[in-house]
Amino acid sequence: MNERYELNKNLAQMLKGGVIMDVTTPEQAVIAEKAGAVAVMALERVPADIRARGGVARMSDPKIIKEIKAAVSIPVMAKVRIGHFVEAQILEALGIDFIDESEVLTPADEMYHIDKWAFKIPFVCGARNLGEALRRIGEGASMIRTKGEAGTGNVVEAVRHMRIINAEIKRLTTLREDELMAAAKELQAPYELVKYVAQHGRLPVVNFAAGGIATPADAALMMQLGADGVFVGSGIFKSQNPEKMAEAIVKAVTYYDKPEILAEVSEGLGEAMQSIDIRKLDEKDLYASRGW
């Protein structure tokens, strides 16, 4: 089991420094691959459409996933509902490359997340803080991402979550070893993982940014804040010029600390996706609060 988990962590590590794009058709997947995406997330609807339509959002139709998988050579991810281990079993049977246990879909279980150790396939999970991140890793997640607030085109929550996680990691590194058990209790996280973070000053898996990233500048901001890479959901194919936006965001992640290049790639992209002021959303419409 440990060998399999180390392999899964290494598979996620190979995506470091890259962009993972949400796609709903094989044609979009091809655009993403040509633009330089390191992986795609196969969906029936991007988060902005899930948010607009409401109702219960579930795992995508296997037919769509298989068509997208056949269209590209890069890894393909797909989402399952929090706690819905049967959806995960189906995706594993389809030969998907990564499973995202996602708060963007309607949770199937409000108490339990999926036992990711029961699967051979690597899992991605969202987190708002270090405790959440370490609990998901303790369940077997091979990759963490900020939850942000998907489908809004508003990066503020992704920034908040990344800063919180980084600050909590930094705090752990200042603690004495005899203080770490109390920290584990406070974080509600496994002691061994808390100890690892305190000793290494980082998570034991890669931590990507996600949720509300809509422009090259947003992507570069998250990279400068310490993200290992970026997920872009609605931001590309809800923009005015998806092909150009996709290429620009990939370049922005590569050259995130080069303002001259960022200025160049941000030029002439047309209008970004329509955005939402998160302060005006009802509590029930906030995806990030799903899961624990």
UniProtKB/Swiss-Prot annotation:
GO terms for molecular function: pyridoxal 5'-phosphate synthase (glutamine hydrolysing) activity. D-ribose 5-phosphate binds at D22, G151, G212, G233, S234. Its EC number is 4.3.3.6. Keywords: Lyase, Pyridoxal phosphate, Schiff base. It holds the Pfam family SOR_SNZ. The keyword Lyase applies. It catalyses: aldehydo-D-ribose 5-phosphate + D-glyceraldehyde 3-phosphate + L-glutamine = pyridoxal 5'-phosphate + L-glutamate + phosphate + 3 H2O + H(+). One of its GO terms (biological process) is pyridoxine biosynthetic process. D-glyceraldehyde 3-phosphate binds at R163. InterPro entries: Aldolase_TIM, PdxS/SNZ, PdxS/SNZ_N, RibuloseP-bd_barrel. SUPFAM superfamilies: Ribulose-phoshate binding barrel (SSF51366). The active site is at K79 (schiff-base intermediate with d-ribose 5-phosphate). Pathway: Cofactor biosynthesis; pyridoxal 5'-phosphate biosynthesis. Catalyzes the formation of pyridoxal 5'-phosphate from ribose 5-phosphate (RBP), glyceraldehyde 3-phosphate (G3P) and ammonia. The ammonia is provided by the PdxT subunit. Can also use ribulose 5-phosphate and dihydroxyacetone phosphate as substrates, resulting from enzyme-catalyzed isomerization of RBP and G3P, respectively. Belongs to the PdxS/SNZ family. NCBIfam families: PRK04180.1 (NF003215), pyridoxal 5'-phosphate synthase lyase subunit PdxS (TIGR00343). In the presence of PdxT, forms a dodecamer of heterodimers. This is Pyridoxal 5'-phosphate synthase subunit PdxS.
